[in-house]
Amino acid sequence: MKMNLQKFAGKTNVFPVLDNEFKAGAAKDSATVIADMETFNVEFSNGIETWTPMDTEGWQRGLMTSKGIKITLSGKRNIGDTGNDFVAGKVYKNGHDAEGYFEWKHPDGTTISWTNAIFDVKNIGGGDSTSVGALEVEINGNGKPTITPAV
């Protein structure tokens, strides 16, 4: 897959973070946008095995052998919103019950999705007494994602 990182949504130059879209649900056909999310962070982890053979005169060699993605979303708990309720509903789940469909649509239209992403809910209403209740979740990729390039 080749993404042109200089062209997003048919435009050139920079883009606002709000152009990213996140959906969650039991399956792709029932997934909806998660309302009231304010911030997101993505963390790519890469497994690199290194070794230092004698024939490289002390210079290390390496090979990337694994990948992982973790997406953190933070916002407000919106009771009654389908996507927000789906995520919050994972808070007391374990095992495969903590999994679900998750999709990240990039500003250029590329989508990355998992049918069994792991929802690690961190907060479903906390904050100080004058704050709006929070919803915070880390979505961990679970296996190789489906990557669909923008058309």
Regions found by a protein language model. Give the residues of each.
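N-terminal leader/targeting segments
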Residues: 1-8
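C-terminal edge-of-domain segments
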Residues: 137-141
